[in-house]
Every structure is written in structure tokens, then in C-alpha cells.
Amino acid sequence: MSDYLIRPAEDRDLEALSAFSRRTFVETFVDGFGIPYPADDLEAFFQKSFSSEALCPRIHDSECVFWIAEREGQIIALCHAGPNDLPHEDAKAGEMELRRLYVGKEAQGLGLGTELLKRALDWMEAHTTGALWIGVWSGNLKAQKLYQAYGFQKVGGYGYPVGEWIDQEFILRRA
């Protein structure tokens, strides 16, 4: 039995969700992968992507799902999925994308990332008859391997802006 709760994100979660997103991004990409983002770029990205003002419309978007996992009142993971926004020539209206799946360092190894991925895939499949899409950083081999195990294949790439810094992302698709 798990010692965490997965539920939809709510307004009351915005401040904690913002802090969790920032912390997890830094732990994963700066500390974990050693990406040397300039401080100004990182802060611009955080404001655009993880501020309460940026997150609020995402948790209320009726075309999306935004779950959090919490343990003892603390957010330990998040999952966001909705209509595909990835820049790929074969993408069609109505197809779905896993937009973000973050698991905090303290919750890794619990199977939570896989559980959230399965929930997201079920939700996406229920909301489209088309392909499912994921954008993943080109250096995150562990995530790529996980997504490949669920039938996703690399079909392209694009530049993902973190402020002025551009990360190289792979586009994965499951038809």
C-alpha cells in the first residue's frame, strides 16, 4: 500500500506546487545533469512556467489534467497532460501530450512516476483516438527508456527554451 495520495491540483496548492516545480527542476537538470543554465535564464523560465500565475490557468484548464501526489501534506510529484502542443509535422488536432511528469528526489524509487505515467496514458487514451506525444530532454536517458517501454518512439526534436538558453528535446510519439 502506498503512503501517498494522488489527486487533482487545486488553488490551495499553487504556492507549494510552484516551489516543488522549481526545486525538482533544479535537482534534476542543474544538480543531476549538470546543465549550466545562467541564473537569469533560469529565473525567467521559472516565472513563465512555475509561478503561481502561470500554474493557475493550467490546473483549471478543462481540456487538461493536472495531478499532484502528496505525502504528509507535502507535494512529492506532479503530472500534467493535455492537448498536444509539440512542434511536429505529423501532429494532428485532438491528439494528447504528456506535458510534465516530475517526481521529487525524496519520492524516487516508490513507483510513483510509473503510476502517474500509467494514469496519464489512460487519461490521454480516453480523450483522443489519435497519437500520444511526449517531449523529453535529449540527455534524460532514464526517462526515454521508460517511455520506450510504454511504446513511445523518437520521431523528432526541437529546441525548448529555458529563458534564452535552448535545451535540445526529443519528440516521442505512440501511435
Locate each region found by the language model.
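Short, conserved catalytic or adaptor-binding loops enriched in Gly and charged residues
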Residues: 1
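Conserved phosphate-binding and hydrolysis motifs of nucleotide-dependent enzymes
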Residues: 73, 77, 111-113, 151
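C-terminal "cap" of GNAT-fold acetyltransferases
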Residues: 92-96, 130-175
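Active-site acidic-Proline motif in GNAT/NAT acetyltransferases
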Residues: 104-106, 110, 138-139
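Conserved acetyl-CoA-binding loop-helix of GNAT-fold acetyltransferases
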Residues: 109-122, 145-149
